[in-house]
């Protein structure tokens, strides 16, 4: 049983998936930083210095805080600014993954086209070709 599990775990797909998950987690941190530290401040500057992460809609009258963390302590809020930031984060990740996959597919097609040379004829095919040529020569 251990041998079967080891063979399964060492197959290319499982190892590739594990590497992909680890790289994806690291990449997620980079994208989150890009959205929070680069894109959203630019969007905030264009819209007059607004910080979208603190945009919320209070769902009870007891909420009167000016920032999201204090408002959550006071009661229920709809944190639509945070949702907007996370949606932008997702769109950036999806676009980057799309571009990576598109590039990989392009390279794969080039490799397939380069290695698409016809296969070498088998010994049987060579013998049949010789027989055909001999028969043609007699006619």
From Swiss-Prot:
It is a multi-pass membrane protein. The keyword Cell membrane applies. It holds the Pfam family MscL. It comes from the Bacteria. Keywords: Cell inner membrane, Cell membrane, Ion channel, Ion transport, Membrane, Transmembrane, Transmembrane helix, Transport. GO terms for molecular function: mechanosensitive monoatomic ion channel activity. The chain crosses the membrane at residues 19-39, 40-60, 81-101. Its main location: membrane. InterPro entries: Mechanosensitive_channel_CS, MS_channel, MSC/AndL, MscL_channel. It is found in: Cell inner membrane. GO terms for cellular component: plasma membrane. Belongs to the MscL family. Channel that opens in response to stretch forces in the membrane lipid bilayer. May participate in the regulation of osmotic pressure changes within the cell. Homopentamer. PANTHER family: LARGE-CONDUCTANCE MECHANOSENSITIVE CHANNEL, MECHANOSENSITIVE CHANNEL MSCL. This is Large-conductance mechanosensitive channel. The gene is mscL.
């Amino acid at each position: 049983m251990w041998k079967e599990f080891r063979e399964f775990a060492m197959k290319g797909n499982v190892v590739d998936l594990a590497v992909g998950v680890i790289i994806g987690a690291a990449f997620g941190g980079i994208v989150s930083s890009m959205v929070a530290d680069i894109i959203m401040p630019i969007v905030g500057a264009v819209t007059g210095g607004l910080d979208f992460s603190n945009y919320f809609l209070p769902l009870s009258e007891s909420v009167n805080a000016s920032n999201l963390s204090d408002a959550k302590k006071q009661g229920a809020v709809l944190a639509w600014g945070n949702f907007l930031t996370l949606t932008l984060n997702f769109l950036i990740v999806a676009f980057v993954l799309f571009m990576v996959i598109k590039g990989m597919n392009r390279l794969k097609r080039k490799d397939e086209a380069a290695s698409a040379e016809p296969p070498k004829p088998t010994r049987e095919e060579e013998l049949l070709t010789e027989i055909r040529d001999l028969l043609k020569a007699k006619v």
